[in-house]
Amino acid sequence: KMWQLIVVSALLGIGSGLIIPLSTGLISKYFVGTYRVKQFGLSSAITNFTLVIATAVTGYLAEVSWHLPFLVYLLPLISILLVGHLKESRSDTAVEPSSQSTAPSGQTAAADTGGSKYGIHIRHLLQIMLFYGVTTFIVLAVIFNLSFLMEKHHFSSGNSGLMISLFFLAIMAPGFCLDKIVDELKERTKAYSLLSMAVGLALIWIAPIEWLIIPGCILVGLGYGVIQPMLYDKTTHTALPQKATMALAFVMMMNYLAILLYPFIIDFLQNLFHTQSQEFPFVFNLLITIVTFFWAYLRRDTFLFNDQLK
C-alpha cells in the first residue's frame, strides 16, 4: 500500500538524517589537520562506493525476486555491531584524560566562531551551506536528467545506467587521495573542481555520443568528489568541537534540500522559458557552474575557498 511505502521511506530518511551527521562528526572529533581531510575523503569514497555496489546488487537481486532487494536494509546490522565496539573504545579512552585533552584543544584553537554565542561562526556556516546547495544542484542534472537526454538520442536505459554508475564512481575516486589533491591545488581546489564540472556538463550537452558523455560524467563526478568532503572539513573549522556535529547537520541538510527542490525549480524555469528541451537542465546548470567558478576563483583567498592544509 502507498501509505506503508511513505511511512517506510520517512523512517529511512529520518534514520539517515540522524546517522550521517553523527558518523561524520566522529571524524572531526578524532582527527585534525591533514589527517582529518584524508579521513573525510576516505569516508566520502567509501560512501559512494557502497552506493554503487548496493545499486548493482539490488538490480541483480530484483531480477531473481522482487523481495530480495529489501535484504539491503539488513546491512545496518553491521553498523549496530560496530557502534557497540565504538562505545567500548570511547570508555577505554576516557580513562586516559591526558591523551584525550590534546585533540580538543587543537580543535578549539583551529575553530573560528566569530565570537558567536552559539559556538558556530554563522556567516561562514551560511556560506558553506549555500555553496554546498549550489554544487549539489549542479550535479543533479546528471542524476535526474541524463537518462531522458540519452533516451532522446536513442540510447538504451542500460547505457544511461552505466553513465550514472561511472558518475558515482568518479565521485568516489578523489576521496582516496584528497589530501594530495588539496596539497597540490591549495586555494584553487574548489575553483578547478568547478571547472572540471563545467567541462563535463558541456561535453554531455554538446555531444550525443557515448565517448563524450562518458568523460563528461566522469569530470562532473570528479569535481563534486573533491568539493563534497572538503566542505565537510571546512565546516569543522566554523564550530567548536562540541558544536561540530550540529554544524555538519545544517550543511548536509542542503544536500537533501537541493534534491527536494531541483525538479520543481527546473520545471518552473522550463515553463518560464517555454521549453521542454532535455538539454535545458544541462545548459542552465552549466551557466550556474561558470558563474560559481568565477566566484570561487576571484574569492580564492577567503575562508570558503582557501583550502591550504596546515
At which residue positions do the language-model features occur?
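Cytoplasmic helix-loop-helix junction between adjacent transmembrane helices
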Residues: 8-47
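Helix-loop-helix hairpin linking two adjacent transmembrane segments in secondary transporters
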Residues: 33-34, 42-85
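Juxtamembrane intracellular "pre-TM" segments in multi-pass secondary transporters
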Residues: 88-128
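A late C-terminal transmembrane helix in Major Facilitator Superfamily
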Residues: 238-274
